[in-house]
Amino acid sequence: MHCDIYKFLKHDDMYIYIARPDYPNDTDEIKDWLGVLPKDFRAGLGRSKFVMHLDLATTPTLARVDKEEVLAKLASQGYFVQLPPQDVMRRQAELRARESQDSIYNT
């Protein structure tokens, strides 16, 4: 299974894997690969940036995620969302809360 990996400027350390089951036979036309994502979810992601193309058949392991879980999600829904580790998510939430409080009290 081939896939493309994207990151999003609004979401540090979150990556989305998009299935490319017909690769390399799907490269002749321009396609919106992110179109497999639910519209509401995609709208909240912001601008995407292509990170890399990956052949999961020749990749022994993946960083921070289970390869079999990725393959199962790609096969069933066409994408896989790799969230940041819990400590990173907690720090980001704390920072957003602090910024929100600062904006309330500094106006």
From Swiss-Prot:
Pfam families attached to this UniProt entry: YcgL (PF05166)
Transmembrane stretches, start-end: none
Coiled coil: none
UniProt cross-references to SUPFAM superfamilies, sorted A to Z: YcgL-like
Gene3D superfamilies: YcgL domain
Alphabetical list of PROSITE patterns matching this protein: YCGL (PS51648)
Domain YcgL span(s) in chain numbering: 1-95
InterPro entries: YcgL-like_sf, YcgL_dom
PANTHER family: PROTEIN YCGL
Descriptive protein name: YcgL domain-containing protein Pcryo_0807
Species name: Psychrobacter cryohalolentis (strain ATCC BAA-1226 / DSM 17306 / VKM B-2378 / K5)
Lineage of producing organism: Bacteria, Pseudomonadati, Pseudomonadota, Gammaproteobacteria, Moraxellales
